[in-house]
């Protein structure tokens, strides 16, 4: 039905939210079409009408006879197109929220052009009820995230409205003093004042206000610290005008034993209820590396069913799967599990990108634009049946697509990802191009499938999008959601070009090193350096990179996202400022450059040439030996995989390809010439990782049963702990390491083989943890090595394994 000349009918009695419902409808359509719909207390020839069941007339109710009555927050729609040209579009909400969501459904499906608005007849007789009662997102005003810290109340309200249009009914805020840094240079407003104002905005949309409030005092054994924390909470709870619920993470962040955490939190909740007596409280048993008994104690405490706890949260960095959490909880809390999914990060997170190529990990980083509609729907539909719904964890606007997808699935999990993306493109970008944009949003997820150089879809999508981009309007080009999609497509294409070039440059440089005996060490080092520096001096796909940087500037102005550190004010590249890595070579640049420095200091030319030759043989173990980098696609084939991604997308119970963030930081800053002044092979940043005591097992075939072998292993986490001086017993990883059935060791000592990591590095030796392999472990020519972490369940990562014959 064409509604360009329609009247939005205003009943005599409207609540504040009902008035906002009509206002949002008119405002949104004016922005998209340029048409100002009249709001009037008298109906027109074509009327748009919004009601809720408990205050509408019998005449309106009669219009919906025979249409399924919705439940709480649900709605029904009639599209009545009469032959004489008159008509009515009537939204009847079960309640105020339902009325708003019914209006939002009209906006999502409206076909809007300049000067024209049409509501599809297919919406007639639609009845919907939200599937899950909790549907929300966390928007934290803190230095650590990559967008929200640059926002004022205006930006928060605009974004909250967008989220509400896709069914969100809750927003979670972060109080001041809950981040590593209290303030950000980007903050346009005081954190306390903004929190209070945004709570009013949330409430005005009929949504619930949540707080994420960890226990992060410096020392809770100090009564002075407790008093200060009590006073701070009183300051927050008394100031915030609306507060419906609070989530307390118990170990991320936080360092208290569950018994102490529960006791302390109970006192904080008493203060909460002085000011917000109806506020619910959820606790989340999150912990990076729980000590023995931590989870047992948590479940013992929760089994007491304290009245002040409303529910339990399934969150990132929890040891148990959601099924296990559900089974271990008392019945009282099983029906009140809140989900807190990390939709924001790509690696080192709750749901890492499956088998993510190193090239993307080094360029897009943990918080690059990460539209993952198919995977997010699959994860949602696996987890959500155990819950009341979710409030997603977000560190910026880069995960915007995932937010919308997740909330829409919470509203109705039978909706396809394709339909949600079509609505997203239609409502937020452009009706006329929505079908094509939705396809791009679906396709871009697959750019990260498998090895980057083997993914032809990256080039196909780039070519298709580039041609499409030339046809769209200026209004679309200036849309920040469109620009984020464009930037991601360009970034993936540029990454592939850069990776191909940098790998080729490394091969050229290594070929030069093989000529050291002929042309001399000084000459080949000089030439190899020149070749390797072409990665920085002559960037790959420079025209694409230039366009990416222009988009980054535009996005900083349009939505506040900080995509570089120095120019846009981002905190760091692993916190969303991923374009900071644009000059980082995607090859063994750091290893070779630092090796050259050491080789040049050798006094003997023969030794220098031999050392240069050895650089090219580093991953060549020699005849009868084996080298494996299990964090690579080839090396991962040696790893036993216990569960498929579909069974365990969070990798709680199965090994996965991972990337060492801090090694990558070192590789990045090598370009500046100061960070980690020792050679670091790129494979040290690529790991196979297991969490929470999950066994890691690797299989090697082709061993000689009569030969004697030793094994060398590089453990990146243990290495970096030792390198920065964490060598106490508590810093050791307790792990049973077995070859076959034989126990090789029961821990990873902080000093490998009794030698100081720093001294080994200073002496030019690579620090490996070495083990003798008993012949009985490979008597049939096959060796199985198994690692099982116990006691404190730290993550275990392995970067390299060498199986070497003994002399």
Describe each model-derived feature in a short phrase.
Residues 9-15, 49-56, 92-94, 141, ...:
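Structural motif
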Residues 113-115, 169, 181, 185-192, ...:
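Catalytic-core regions of glycoside hydrolase
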Residues 394-402, 414-625:
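C-terminal non-catalytic alpha-helical accessory regions
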Residues 613-807:
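Extracytoplasmic
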Residues 125-147, 210-217:
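N-terminal small/glycine-rich loop or linker at the start of catalytic domains
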Residues 151-176:
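Catalytic domains of carbohydrate-active enzymes, especially glycoside hydrolases
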Residues 140-154, 218-226, 368:
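Active-site mouth loops of central-metabolism enzymes
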Residues 1-132:
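Contiguous, structured surface segment used for ligand recognition
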């Amino acid at each position: 039905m064409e509604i360009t000349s329609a009247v939005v009918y205003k009943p005599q009695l409207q609540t504040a939210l009902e008035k906002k419902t009509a206002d949002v409808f008119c405002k949104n359509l004016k922005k998209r079409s340029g048409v100002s719909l009249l709001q009037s207390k008298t109906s027109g020839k074509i009327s748009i009408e919004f009601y809720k069941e408990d205050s509408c007339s019998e005449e309106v109710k009669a219009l919906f006879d025979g249409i399924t009555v919705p439940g709480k927050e649900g709605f029904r729609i009639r599209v009545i197109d009469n032959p004489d040209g008159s008509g009515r579009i009537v939204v009847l909400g079960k309640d105020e929220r339902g009325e708003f969501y019914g209006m939002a459904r009209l906006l999502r499906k409206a076909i809007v052009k300049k000067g024209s608005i049409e509501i599809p007849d297919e919406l007639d007789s639609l009845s919907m009820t939200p599937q899950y009662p909790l549907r929300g997102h966390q928007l934290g005003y803190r230095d650590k995230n990559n967008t929200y810290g640059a926002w004022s109340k205006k930006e928060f309200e605009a974004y909250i409205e967008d989220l509400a249009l896709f069914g969100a009914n809750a927003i979670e805020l972060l109080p001041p003093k809950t981040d590593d840094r209290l303030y950000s240079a980007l903050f346009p407003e005081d954190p306390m004042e903004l929190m209070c104002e945004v709570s009013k905005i949330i409430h005005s949309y009929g949504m619930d206000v949540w707080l994420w409030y960890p226990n992060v005092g410096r020392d809770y054994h100090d009564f002075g610290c407790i008093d200060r924390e009590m006073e701070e909470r009183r300051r927050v709870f008394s100031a915030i005008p609306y507060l419906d619920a609070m989530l307390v993470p118990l170990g991320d962040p936080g360092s208290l034993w569950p018994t102490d955490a529960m006791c302390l939190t109970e006192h904080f909740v008493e203060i909460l209820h002085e000011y917000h007596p109806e506020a619910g409280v959820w606790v989340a048993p999150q912990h990076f590396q729980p000590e023995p008994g931590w989870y047992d104690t948590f479940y013992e405490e929760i089994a007491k069913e304290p009245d002040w706890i409303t529910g339990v949260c399934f969150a990132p960095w929890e040891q148990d799967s959601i099924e296990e959490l559900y089974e271990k909880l008392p019945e009282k809390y099983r029906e009140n599990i809140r989900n807190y999914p990390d939709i924001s990060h790509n690696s080192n997170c709750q749901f890492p990108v499956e088998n993510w190529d190193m090239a993307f990990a080094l360029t897009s980083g943990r918080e690059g634009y990460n539209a993952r509609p198919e995977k997010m729907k699959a994860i949602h539909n696996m987890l959500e049946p155990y819950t009341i719904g979710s409030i997603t964890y977000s560190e910026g606007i880069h995960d915007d697509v995932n937010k919308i997808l997740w909330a829409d699935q919470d509203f109705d999990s039978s909706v396809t990802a394709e339909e949600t993306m079509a609505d997203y493109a239609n409502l937020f970008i452009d009706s006329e191009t929505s079908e094509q944009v939705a396809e791009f949003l679906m396709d871009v997820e697959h750019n990260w499938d498998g090895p980057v150089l083997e993914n032809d879809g990256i080039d196909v999508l780039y070519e298709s999008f580039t041609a499409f981009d030339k046809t769209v309007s200026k209004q679309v080009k200036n849309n920040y959601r469109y620009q984020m999609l464009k930037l991601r497509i360009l970034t993936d294409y540029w990454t592939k070009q850069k990776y191909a070039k940098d790998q080729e440059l490394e091969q050229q440089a290594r070929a030069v090193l093989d000529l050291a005996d002929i042309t001399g060490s000084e000459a080949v080092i000089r030439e190899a350096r020149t070749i390797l520096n072409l990665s920085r001096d002559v960037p790959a796909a420079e025209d694409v990179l230039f366009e990416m940087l222009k988009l980054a500037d535009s996005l900083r102005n349009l939505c506040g996202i900080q995509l570089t550190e120095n120019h846009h004010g981002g905190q760091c590249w692993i916190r969303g400022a991923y374009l900071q890595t644009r000059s980082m070579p995607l090859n063994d640049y750091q290893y070779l450059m630092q090796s050259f420095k050491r080789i040049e200091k050798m006094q003997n030319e023969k030794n220098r040439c031999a050392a240069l030759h050895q650089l090219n043989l580093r991953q060549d173990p020699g005849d009868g030996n084996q080298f494996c980098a299990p964090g690579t696609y080839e090396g991962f084939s040696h790893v036993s995989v216990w569960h498929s991604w579909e069974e365990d997308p969070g990798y709680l119970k199965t090994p996965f390809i991972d990337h060492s963030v801090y090694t990558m930081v070192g590789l990045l800053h090598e370009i500046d010439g100061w960070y980690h002044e020792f050679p670091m092979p790129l494979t040290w940043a690529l790991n196979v990782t297991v969490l929470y005591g999950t066994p890691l097992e690797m299989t090697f075939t082709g061993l000689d049963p009569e030969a004697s072998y030793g094994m060398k292993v590089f453990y990146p986490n243990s290495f970096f702990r030792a390198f920065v001086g964490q060598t106490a017993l508590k810093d050791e990883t307790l792990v049973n390491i077995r070859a076959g059935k034989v126990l090789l060791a029961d821990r990873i000592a902080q000093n490998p083989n009794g030698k100081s990591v720093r001294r080994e590095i200073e002496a030019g030796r690579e620090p490996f943890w070495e083990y003798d392999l008993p012949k009985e472990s490979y008597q049939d020519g096959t060796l199985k090595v198994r690692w099982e972490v116990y006691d404190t369940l730290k993550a275990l990562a392995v970067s390299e394994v060498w199986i070497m014959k003994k002399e």
